[in-house]
Structures are given as structure tokens and as C-alpha cells.
Amino acid sequence: MAFEQFALVISLFQQLCVYLVIAWLLSKTPLFMPLTQVTLSWPHKILCYLIFSGFCVMGTYFGLRVEDSIANTRAIGAVLGGIVGGPVVGLLVGLTGGIHRYSLGGFTALACTFSTIAEGLLGGLVHRHFVARHRLDLLFSPWVVGSVALIAELMQMGIILLVARPYDDAVHLIENIIAPMLVANTLGAAMFMRMILDHRAMLEKYSVAFSARALKIAERAMRVL
């Protein structure tokens, strides 16, 4: 059992590497810009919805079949959609990812639909909490995001136990996937946010450099005048 779980962790990390490479490539485009700030405008919210819905669906596609279910990294897209975009974006990302998962079938399909929606909402509530308290440093913290993803995955396991039937099959499934999915989704969400945070720091550095250069030009202009 331990060897099977270890093998599943390795497999999920292989899929996660592809996932993060795609995220890194996206970070080199202007589309990544809205993800580095608290999203207020609707165009930015729509873009966040599209991007994180894509990652949510991708997390399912990159998943691995385990006993008529799918071990996956879907929670990363749902949680980050809520954290970056807010409750509405989180709900819509979770709904999109959940409907897609339901379409694939399996005895956990309905439970995974509910849990994905709940994960998006959880991220959205965390967003609202930190924005209301003006703690954007925590909102963009990889440690916080990883912790939220961990809680989201534990919540998903609970929903599977409550909803999926037969119950014995649900228990057996969770015994096999809980450790690999907790590790993969927690680290994956933290690494994704680290990427966003690094991009955010780079933009701030460029902004400071541009402001300093503009100030020097203004000073020279004043001397001429």
C-alpha cells in the first residue's frame, strides 16, 4: 500500500511538472498580468475565470485513474481562482471544473463536483477575508495558499465520504489517494503562487526603476528651465 501511494505521488508530480511549465509559459505573456494583483475590474475577473478554469480542467485531464475515480490536481485551479479573483470567480471556476469532472463519470463524480465548487468558494472566502483586512501580503503568500489547498483537499475527502456510494469503496479509495493528493495539491498551489509572487515582485521592480528614471528626466528638465 505504501509503495502504491509513493508511486502515485511520483506520477502526480510528473503531471504537476507539466502543469507548472504551462503556468510558467503563461507568465511570459500579458495574460498573466491580472493574476499578480487583486482583481477588481470585470475584464480582469473574466480573464482570471478563464485561466483558472483552464487549469482546473487541466488538473483533471492530467489526473490518474484510480479505482473508477481520478487522482488529480484540480484543486489548484479552483483554490487559486477564488484567492486571486474573489468569491464569484472562485464559485464559477469551481462550477466549471466540477461540471467537467461530473461529465467524466465514476462513483465519485457527484462528490467531486460538490467538492470542486466548495474549493473555489473556500479560496474566494480567503480572498475576501484578507482583502477586508488589507493583508495582501498574506493573500499572495505561498504558505497561506498551500495551507488553503491542504484544507480544501481534506474537505474534498470528507465530501467524498458523505456523498459517494458504495461507502466502503469510498473509504478504500480515500485510503489510497489521500496522501498523494494532499502532497501534490498543497505543494502545487504553493509553487503556483510562488510563481505569481515572483512575477509580481519583478513588475514592482520595473515600476520603481521606471519611476526613478522619470524623476531624473524631470529634474534635468527643471534645470534647463
Residue ranges and their predicted role:
Residues 39-42, 87:
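Recognition helices and adjacent regulatory flanks at domain boundaries
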Residues 30-36:
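N-terminal membrane-insertion alpha helix
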